[in-house]
Amino acid sequence: NWFFDNVCIPKIIEFKEIFKSGGGHFNQAIFNNDVPYIMNSFWVNFQKQHEFNPLHNHTGLFSFVIFMKIPYDYREQRMIPHVKISNTPCAGDFVFVHVDLMGKICSYSYPLDPSCEGLILFFPSKIRHLVYPFYNCEEPRISVAGNVWFKSKK
């Protein structure tokens, strides 16, 4: 399909170029040019204020999220009283969570606002991630997500 051929495959190639030198046997299997890929699943998320997607990962090899509609601004979200007093003000953020080489749990946040509409995040499916709730906005946050797998020989 058009999306897979024109968006996912170039992202896989880009990912392969960045990470081909590390990872030993794992990377040799994933980044072999003869390995075919397939988009296994594709869905749309509609989230209302106060809703969130807890820490999780996906099946498959790669996953992606496309932010279609961000009806709030993270700067305004940070000013909401219960968010402002937090030691980690992250209302409305998309966050990756990982463990560093020393075992420390680390996170990388994508603060979201309308300028992020159309942004595609493409990442290994096993990287854990979450989406924090947003507040004081009646419009839904809309994203499209999916998973890429190795294509079965069957």
How would you describe each model-predicted region?
Residues 24-26, 94, 148:
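Compositionally biased, intrinsically disordered low-complexity regions
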Residues 1-61:
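Signature of the catalytic double-stranded beta-helix
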Residues 40-122, 130-132, 139-142:
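Catalytic core of non-heme Fe(II) oxygenases with the double-stranded beta-helix
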Residues 145-154:
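Double-stranded beta-helix
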